[in-house]
């Protein structure tokens, strides 16, 4: 009987360990266009897997379909979390093809890009409502965060009780104002960083491990 009990205990411990590890958590990277979402996704993926998620560009709506990088394991301060990064298209209330003409695009290409960007917004919202288990919300610290889109998205995230980490990106720029982002969403902690330069990424990784583990 003692041997049987010991065997059951051993099996139980192994089973608990397997279920404790679970599936990687799907963490969506959200924010307005050109906030640096893909730059951040690539920074995280390269730091922990050596691979990139997708191309980066100064032209708005470079990411027009959600891209996923699976099984990214982040370790900090004794905590470990494995996540699937979902780099989502920038969310906005209006996509105008004329915006792309300013970047020397032909009209046909600009119209196509604006259509794809609009579809990308819908896809990003679907991921938010149905599939992600946590959110990294990226804001450009050189821009005013008090916008309809930011307020709406943060409200949706909160209504779904999703853990959210707000990042004030582009602190490498002289005009960056971290405090305006902290003031816009005082109910959440704001972490400054430069995804492009890698500034303060250690703290970002600490918070990812803390928020999503």
Placement of each model-derived feature along the sequence:
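Canonical P-loop GTPase G-domain recognition
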Residues: 170-213
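Conserved C-terminal guanine-recognition region of P-loop GTPase G domains, centered on the G4
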Residues: 112-188
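Conserved G1/Walker A P-loop phosphate-binding module
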Residues: 2-103
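Conserved nucleotide-binding/hydrolysis micro-motifs of P-loop NTPases
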Residues: 62, 90-92, 142-144, 170-174, ...
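Charged, alpha-helix-enriched surfaces in structured cytosolic catalytic cores
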Residues: 35, 39, 64, 148, ...
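A solvent-exposed, charged loop/short amphipathic helix patch at secondary-structure junctions
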Residues: 99-114
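Conserved P-loop NTPase architecture
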Residues: 1-19, 24-28, 33, 146-147, ...
């Amino acid at each position: 009987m003692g041997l049987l009990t010991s065997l059951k205990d051993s099996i139980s411990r192994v089973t608990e360990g397997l279920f404790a590890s679970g599936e990687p958590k799907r963490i969506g990277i959200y924010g307005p266009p050109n906030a640096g979402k893909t730059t951040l996704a690539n920074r995280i993926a390269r730091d922990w897997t050596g691979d990139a998620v997708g191309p980066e560009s100064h032209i708005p709506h470079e990411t027009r379909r959600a891209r996923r990088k699976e099984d990214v394991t982040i370790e900090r301060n004794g905590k470990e979390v494995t996540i699937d990064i979902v780099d989502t298209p920038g969310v906005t209330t209006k996509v105008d093809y004329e915006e792309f003409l300013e970047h020397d695009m032909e009209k046909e290409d600009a119209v196509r890009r604006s259509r794809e960007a609009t579809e990308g917004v819908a896809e990003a919202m679907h991921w938010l409502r149905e599939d992600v288990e946590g959110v990294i919300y990226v804001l450009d610290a050189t821009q005013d965060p008090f916008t309809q889109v930011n307020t709406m998205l943060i409200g949706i995230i909160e209504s779904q009780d999703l853990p959210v980490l707000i990042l004030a990106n582009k602190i490498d720029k002289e005009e960056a104002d971290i405090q305006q982002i902290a003031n816009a969403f005082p109910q959440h902690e704001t972490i400054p960083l430069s995804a492009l330069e890698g500034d303060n990424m250690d703290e970002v990784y600490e918070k990812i491990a803390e928020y999503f583990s």
